[in-house]
Amino acid sequence: ETGPTWQAMRLSRNRNWGQPITVDYLQDLSVKVAKHTSWSGIYVGDISQPRGGPMLSGHASHQIGLDADIWLLPKTDKVLTRAKRENISSISMRRASGAFTNGRWTKDHEKVLQLAASDQRVARIFLFPGAKVAMCKSTTGNRSWLRKIRPWYGHHYHFHVRLKCPNGQKSCVNQAPPPPGDGCKEAENWVKRILDPPPPNPNAKPRKPKRPITLARLPQQCTGVLSAL
């Protein structure tokens, strides 16, 4: 729950469980952040439930212990109590519905994202499009890490790290990697759509409602987990 350079937040949600590779990654990242920025480490949000699986609220992902939310609120050197970690909130970094960063966004935020994305264990990172465009404009030298920063809805209070499947875990299937290149043009297109939304398509078909989650739709391993409870 607490280390020298990290703290898990919102413990009452019981979503601070991850695979060993995820725990190692978060601890490693927190040390790097404390060393290379003015932050004292990182605040860790949701990872997964104790036995994985879908959650009742908040996420469609975070089901197999390889996803983690990292708050964009800079960590201080103060150790927060459990009660404080329930009440303190992260802060939004977006302006104009995510088209731009706001005045709270700093060079240290960019460094944290660079450190997070540069790790070989990372598959992709989700962040609001305005932040990606800001980093595209300011980054010089090695830009390869930008490829892993993917623009996505929300994600302006935290960024979402998704790790690659651990070696030897046959039941885990990696997503296709992000397209080649730094992905900056794609992020710019996201911003353009925010600032100048396309008109609604009068011929668009209504979205189908999401199918309910049933045990039959979950991986076979879930049956064994639930049977053991």
What are the residue ranges of the model-derived segments?
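Short, functionally critical alpha-helical segments immediately adjacent to catalytic or ligand/cofactor-binding
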Residues: 44-48, 67, 161
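Short, solvent-exposed beta-strand-terminating loops
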Residues: 72-82
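Catalytic cores and adjacent binding grooves of peptidoglycan-active enzymes
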Residues: 80-229
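Active-site acidic/histidine clusters and adjacent loop/turn architecture
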Residues: 1-44, 105-115, 119-122
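Extracytoplasmic
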Residues: 37-39, 63-68, 156-158
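Extended, low-complexity, intrinsically disordered C-terminal regulatory tails
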Residues: 25-57, 124-148
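Short, surface-exposed glycine/acidic/tryptophan-bearing loops
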Residues: 57-74
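Short secondary-structure capping micro-motifs at structural edges
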Residues: 55-59, 111-112
